[in-house]
Amino acid sequence: LDYHFISGLPRSGSSLLAALLRQNPRVHAEVTSPLARLYAAMLMGMSEEYPSNVQLDDAQRARLLRGIFDAFYQDRQQAQWVFDTNRAWCSRLPALAALFPDTRIVCCVREVGWIVDSFERLAQAQPLRLSALFGYDPEDSLSMRADLLTGARGVLGYALDGLRQAVYGDHAERLLLLRYETLARHPAQAMEQVYAFLQMPAFAHDYANLEGDAARFDAALQTPGLHRVRRTVGYVPRRSVLPPELFERLQQLAFWETEPLPGVRIV
C-alpha cells in the first residue's frame, strides 16, 4: 500500500475530498481515523520514560510505527493508495517523510471566518444539545465558542498551528493546499490538480452522485451533520451568522492568503 494523507483545517472540504477519492476503486479514503492517536500512543510507549526502551533503536521504532499503518489497513489490500485523514498529520510531517519517503499531504483550507461560521451554524442547528467541540459548556456564547475553536487547544487553533508548522518546515514540497472554494466551485479542475500533485493517474469522478456520511462518529461528538457530504458538489453562497467585526478578525488568520509560502502549492 502507498500511504498519503488528508489534513489541514476542519470544515474545509476534507470529507468532500475523501468522498470523491472513494469513487476511485484504486483508492481507500475515509473521514478522520483513529490512526493518528494510535501513532501517538505508540510514540509514548516507546519513549525513554520507560527504562527498558533504551533497547529500541531508530530502525525498530520505524518498523513499529509503520506496522501500525499496515495493521490498521490490512483489510484494504485491494486498494493501491490509502489516504488517512487527521488534523494531526501536518504536525507529524517530518516523521511521515521518514517512514514513507514518497508520501504527500493534501491540506484542505478555507477562509477562517467561514470555518467558524460553519461550526456556529452546526451549534445553532442543535439548540437542545451540547457539543463536544465546545466542551459541553452550557454557558458559552458565540464569541466564546469562536475563542474556544481558535485557541491553541481548540480544534481549529490546533489545526492552524500544525498547518503553519508544515508549510514553513523542511518538507513543504510534500504539501498541496486545497482551498474549499476551489473544490466546491471547480471540482474537476481541483481533482486534476490533486492527482497531478500525487503523481497518480487521473480518474473520471461523478460530481453529482456522492456518498458520504459518518453518523456514528458525529453522534459521538453530539454534532449531527459534522461530516455529512451533499450528494452533488457545489458551492452554496450564504450570509455569515457571525458579527462583522468577529468575522473580519477571524479572516486575518488565513495566513496562506497573505504570506509567501515558498515551495508550497496552492489550488
Q: What feature does the model see in each segment?
A:
Residues 1-4, 145-152, 156-160, 164-173, ...:
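PAPS-dependent sulfotransferases, especially Golgi type II membrane carbohydrate sulfotransferases
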Residues 15-18, 37-39, 90-92, 113-118, ...:
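Short catalytic/ligand-binding loop motif for oxyanion handling, primarily in non-cytosolic enzymes
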Residues 6-8, 82-85, 107-109, 177-179:
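Short beta-strand segments
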Residues 1-70, 76, 124, 213, ...:
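PAPS-dependent sulfotransferase catalytic core
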Residues 61-75, 117-197, 254:
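PAPS-dependent sulfotransferase catalytic domain
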Residues 13-27, 96-100, 177-202:
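PAPS/PAP-binding and catalytic site of the sulfotransferase fold
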Residues 68-95:
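Glycine-rich phosphate-binding loop used to anchor ATP phosphates in small-molecule kinases
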Residues 96-121:
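Conserved phosphate-donor/acceptor-positioning beta-strand/loop module used by diverse small-molecule
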